[in-house]
């Protein structure tokens, strides 16, 4: 399909710069293709009532790391330049791949000293520069010591459409982190997860809905635009994920009992679909996935998806169109824009039913 088929105009004021407070007050658009009504305006607080006893809620327990680092490169003679690096992929115990700005001012072998706003520094040497724009850094620390240093001096990697309008602050340390985050490794939040609170999770459990975790580390590629004119020419970025044998067995048991698989976010959806067989059985999975889901894809495992409202021409809006049908997706997004829904990472959500 042509990528411009997934384009739409979004007024700038529809982009959320902060999450709803309280979280459960965020709006929720229920989308049921072929039902009457097809579109139903609710709130996140209504979610327990929209699920059924016996359903399984699948959440991504990845944890966002403060992956944006500010530093200085100094050359012999004293010339300096400010460097901003966003870590995107761990290469070893002491090395990371990153996007750096301005990368053209860095040379292999040079040292960058990253510093935190409240003190502390971290040195890194430029190992390599790739044509893709990646810069590989070897840090002076390794393992848990490196992790602690990054946590101390790093900034939360807010999406470009938020960072362009306001600076990151202390609130983002909690606002941009899901309540069930556990496994460090993401450089962007699985944003549908941001709507959950302990109280909401307790109400969902009381409804008779079980909860299972998978892990998919969200990479910076989630923000990269689709440059191809046709979806068949786009290469999806790869992200690391895991579905444990125990979780796979439990989800298969839920399906065997007639329960629905409710995937929270595009990350959990893509991982579960990667792990599923054509017959719908979910297998244990460990490794990278670059699954690219577009209209025409036959879903194997996910029955219902909770997700935010996404960017025009993005792979995420293509996933939504695949889930409920392209025409339904267009109607849902037009309704959301006209009705004042808030878009993107800190915005409102939709509950998609197939």
From Swiss-Prot:
Keywords: Cytoplasm, Queuosine biosynthesis, S-adenosyl-L-methionine, Transferase
EC numbers, comma separated: 2.4.99.17
Catalytically driven reaction(s): 7-aminomethyl-7-carbaguanosine(34) in tRNA + S-adenosyl-L-methionine = epoxyqueuosine(34) in tRNA + adenine + L-methionine + 2 H(+)
Keyword RNA-binding carried by entry: no
GO cellular component: cytoplasm
Subcellular compartments: Cytoplasm
Gene3D superfamilies: QueA-like
GO BP annotation list: queuosine biosynthetic process; tRNA wobble guanine modification
Signal peptide (UniProt feature, chain positions): none
Main location: cytoplasm
NCBIfam families found in the cross-reference section: PRK00147.1, queA
Family of this protein: Belongs to the QueA family.
Quaternary data: Monomer.
Task performed by this protein: Transfers and isomerizes the ribose moiety from AdoMet to the 7-aminomethyl group of 7-deazaguanine (preQ1-tRNA) to give epoxyqueuosine (oQ-tRNA).
Listed name of the protein: S-adenosylmethionine:tRNA ribosyltransferase-isomerase
